């Protein structure tokens, strides 16, 4: 933000010195000298053209984009595992959307396909922040191959909507997070007492792993509320929660 830079002259001076004296490194990050929407400056590892290439893969529903968020590993690797040979041994990593098929890391945590709320939340917040710099004219196809082009804010809204669908009732009255259990889906004692699972099945959205992971899966509470147009992730979690207090709804 321009007013923030004005309050940090030493930071700006050191930053500009570094960018001018190390052009080899400056060429790898965003163009600091080019102001964006509202004269904002962008300091990021990805430039616009690289972001579009990354999002083309991330927003592909045959790869990372699930009905319920962004997968931790591309679904492409379900049929095409990544293979590595080292010192006569062969290792492979394939897409595993639910419970781990390996005893590594205790066997109950899996980063090879499921949807993880903390990573998805950071993606959503980052997209909102990039939109504050690029504005509505910077668009990407979402989902990839659909012919529908959205601003980064609209992409963030779409990913956020999918994450919320983990917990909200669908048209069939089911909550994806509760899986195929008739008791959890229909019994009044369970169907509305939603648990915050550690991670979620990359295809079905069913809750997996520890079932009381409120420390991060509870972040969906922030996504369920409408986001003000000017909201920034620079607001603390407490400030965001106060803005969503029951008395303010």
Spell out what each predicted region is.
Residues 1-249:
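Acidic, mature catalytic/reactive cores of soluble proteins
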């Amino acid at each position: 933000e321009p007013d923030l830079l004005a309050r940090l002259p030493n930071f700006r001076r050191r930053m500009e010195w570094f960018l001018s004296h190390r052009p080899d490194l400056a060429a790898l990050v965003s163009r600091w000298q080019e102001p964006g929407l509202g004269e904002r400056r962008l300091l990021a590892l990805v430039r616009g053209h690289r972001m579009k290439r990354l999002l083309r893969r991330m927003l592909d529903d045959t790869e990372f984009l699930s009905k319920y968020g962004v997968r931790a590993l591309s679904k492409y690797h379900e049929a095409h595992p990544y293979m590595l040979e080292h010192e006569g041994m062969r290792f492979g990593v394939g897409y595993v959307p639910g419970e781990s098929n390996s005893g590594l890391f205790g066997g109950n945590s899996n980063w090879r396909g499921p949807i993880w709320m903390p990573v998805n939340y950071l993606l959503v917040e980052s997209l909102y922040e990039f939109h504050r710099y690029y504005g509505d004219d910077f668009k990407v196809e979402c989902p990839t191959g659909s012919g529908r082009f959205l601003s980064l804010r609209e992409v963030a809204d779409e990913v956020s909507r999918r994450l919320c669908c983990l917990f909200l009732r669908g048209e069939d009255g089911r909550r994806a997070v509760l899986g195929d259990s008739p008791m959890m889906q229909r019994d009044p004692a369970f169907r509305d007492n939603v648990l915050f699972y550690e991670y979620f099945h990359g295809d079905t959205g069913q809750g997996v792993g520890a079932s009381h992971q409120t420390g991060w899966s509870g972040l969906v509470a922030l996504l369920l509320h409408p986001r003000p147009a000017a909201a920034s992730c620079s607001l603390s979690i407490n400030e965001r929660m106060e803005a969503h207090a029951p008395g303010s709804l």
